[in-house]
């Protein structure tokens, strides 16, 4: 098998490059940390200081907002922001969940925003096993680590109050509770590695299962990125949602149509009438007692997903009525753009390393090292190296067995 090595040479992997993750918000947020708050706040974008405050006994702080100013245990803190740094090796508990790093607290429109400020590599320890089963092969976990690092590197922006969130709207981040030795090893093995295009972090979208054909970014979001094309993906064939079937009650179909402002009376027939290269819905025709309407482009796929379908790579049966549910049959799960996690599993089980996995799902990209622009808190990329464009010496079986 062709093997590629990445040499860091004299360039250091970024250390002390912090990311700011919104982990909780509300009228009050409880924070537990064995250090007293600093005011004015230390810079959350700077490397952790060599000398830190002497830890006091563990404190629990109920943080609120009054008159646009933060309160600590009911007392006016005299500031709209506070940064609570940890002592070496300690952790911070925010709204009942434990994280590495510190916490930046902000008063924002009458609520408290709790933002975990954490080194990017420590952040990944709470992301990778939350997004991919930690029991999966090392190469698949390594690929997930690289795309997770790339995702957040592209979003670090000191001009904004935070860089990313902790939910599926961004990247799932569960903190210390999610950490697993296998994921930690994958993060360490790929330290600093990101996927780059045009000298910048690529948009490393991923989904659970492509259903055998990845979607292009253009067909799903209307944004054409050359390294996110529609392409055949035989390696996802063994996933649990490779094929699925769903029956949707007429009332649910009618409600979904109403959300898209389709007004054709009582629905009688709904079907996909045009698909993209990847087999995903690009036009849905809805016929009712008052006429016919069509949903096209991204609306077509969104409508199919609104029916409860795991993917828009689906067909609709046609007839629908009070006693006739709409039958939806399809393949895959998620939007289908970029890396397919079950495809990464299939490639890893066939002996491919993470470089070949990344190269297959993000063609035309390069592997780069993440560094930090001195004094800016912004990431920069160094040592670009093209990723392999296709898996090496691979039998296209699509099987996931060992």
Task: Mark where each language-model region is.
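Conserved, single-site charged/polar hotspot
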Residues: 1-402
């Amino acid at each position: 098998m062709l093997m590629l090595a990445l040499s860091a040479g004299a360039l250091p992997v970024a250390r002390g490059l912090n990311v700011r993750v919104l982990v909780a918000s509300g009228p009050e947020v409880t924070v537990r940390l064995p250090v007293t708050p600093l005011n004015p706040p230390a810079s959350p974008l700077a490397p952790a200081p060599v000398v830190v405050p002497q830890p006091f006994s563990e404190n629990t702080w109920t943080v609120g907002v009054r008159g646009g100013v933060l309160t600590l245990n009911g007392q006016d803190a005299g500031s709209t922001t506070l940064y609570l740094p940890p002592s070496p090796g300690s952790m911070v508990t925010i709204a009942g969940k434990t994280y590495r790093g510190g916490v930046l607290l902000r008063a924002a429109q009458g609520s408290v925003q709790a933002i975990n400020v954490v080194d990017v590599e420590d952040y990944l320890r709470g992301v990778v096993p939350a997004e991919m089963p930690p029991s999966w092969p090392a190469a698949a976990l390594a690929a997930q680590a690289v795309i997770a690092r790339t995702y957040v590197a592209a979003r670090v922006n000191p001009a904004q109050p935070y860089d990313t969130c902790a939910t599926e709207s961004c990247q799932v981040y569960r903190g210390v509770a999610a950490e697993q030795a296998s994921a930690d090893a994958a993060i360490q093995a790929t330290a600093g590695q990101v996927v780059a295009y045009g000298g910048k972090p690529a948009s490393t979208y991923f989904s659970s299962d492509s259903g055998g054909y990845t979607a292009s970014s253009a067909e799903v979001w209307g944004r054409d990125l050359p390294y996110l094309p529609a392409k055949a993906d035989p390696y996802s064939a063994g996933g649990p949602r490779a094929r699925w079937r769903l029956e949707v009650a007429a009332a649910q179909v009618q409600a979904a149509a109403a959300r898209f402002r389709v007004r054709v009376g009582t629905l009688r027939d709904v079907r996909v009438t045009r698909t993209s290269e990847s087999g995903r819905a690009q036009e849905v025709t809805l016929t009712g007692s008052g006429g016919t309407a069509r949903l096209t482009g991204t609306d077509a796929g969104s409508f199919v997903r609104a029916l409860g379908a795991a993917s828009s790579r689906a067909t609709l049966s046609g007839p629908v009525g009070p006693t006739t549910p709409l039958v939806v049959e399809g393949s895959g799960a998620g939007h289908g753009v970029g890396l397919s996690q079950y495809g990464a599993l299939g490639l890893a089980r066939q002996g491919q390393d993470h470089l070949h996995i990344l190269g297959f799902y993000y063609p035309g990209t390069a592997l780069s090292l993440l560094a930090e622009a001195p004094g800016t808190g912004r990431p920069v990329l160094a040592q670009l190296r093209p990723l392999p464009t296709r898996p090496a010496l691979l039998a296209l079986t699509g099987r996931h067995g060992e």
